[in-house]
Amino acid sequence: QTCALPIWRYKNREKWEGAITCNLAVWRDDLYKINGFNQQYHGWGYEDSDLVIRLINSGKHRKEGRYAVGVIHLWHKENDRNLSDININLLKNSIQNKTTITNTGIKNYGTD
């Protein structure tokens, strides 16, 4: 017998709020098309939201995995939040400009 996933899993498919990358799956080709994470983010905050916003802006949709997938979290020191004001401005820029691709991402590391 299978366990059906709730219908709410498919709600808010274009909502970036609440999406976090502690347990995010994305197709490699889709990640490459938006050039991965924006490397302009430093310290704590908003780089995962920026990634999700650009995926949504490029036509991809979310599926909620809550209560359906396991989470394994590696302990790490919490990042410095001193730059969060700069990071939130980067995020606002991605939202306002409907950004899909970052200039500072995967391709800066020599991947094709």
PLM regions and their residue ranges:
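Short, small-residue-biased leader/transition segments that mark boundaries at the very start
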Residues: 2-5
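A generic structural signal for short coil/turn motifs at secondary-structure boundaries
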Residues: 40-42, 81
